[in-house]
Amino acid sequence: MRKAITILCILFSFNVYSQCVGPQSSTISPLGPYQPGDVVTVNYTLSSFSQVNVNWIHAFELDLGSGWMQNTIVASGNPGNIGGSSGYWLWDNQHTFPSGLNFGPGWRFVHGVVANWGTVSTGPFSISVTMTVKQTCNPEDLHIGVIVYGDCQTGGWNNGACCSDPAYSVYQGNVQPTPITTSNINHY
């Protein structure tokens, strides 16, 4: 009986915490910790997206700490649209979706037929970004996360419960500022 309850709890928690988003992975180069001016490349892959309630994948948003220079983000390629809907992926620094979701920076899908719908593609999807650590004397937050949105969350589709998947954590850390060294002061 305990085994059955344990299995049910595991299945329930998987369903609650990962409704649409399948396996995710990432690499980061170079490995941290980071100092001001360091340039970092992140590669992220979402292996699959389950279309619960015909909820199509719509966007990949970067969740970044305050220690990153937002104006240095360079996106490479796009997430891909294997067997997907007509349309294209657009890199966007800021966009407000019909649901009121303030989005950016990240990739969002621009559907070729129906505005504000995602793509029917189930993946895999890969993104790559390069960014620079801010010049600072403080240990500012350098977390990096990726949030995946379906068109139900962005307001383009309404067919029952939306997927509510947590952000995927790529990196947790703070800027490691180089200590300022000064010579001894001589009062003679």
Where are these regions (language model features)?
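Bacterial Sec-dependent N-terminal signal peptides
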Residues: 1-25
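Enriched but not universal
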Residues: 4-6, 178-188
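Serine/threonine-rich, low-complexity linker/repeat segments that form flexible spacers/stalks
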Residues: 19-55, 167-181
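Solvent-exposed, conformationally flexible loop/turn segments
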Residues: 31-39, 120-124, 188
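Low-complexity, serine/threonine/proline/glycine-rich extracellular segments that form mucin-like
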Residues: 36-84
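A surface/secretory-pathway sequence property marking extracellular, secreted
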Residues: 66-110
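Low-complexity, intrinsically disordered segments enriched in Ser/Thr together with acidic residues
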Residues: 100-142, 151
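Serine/threonine-enriched low-complexity regions used as flexible
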Residues: 132-169
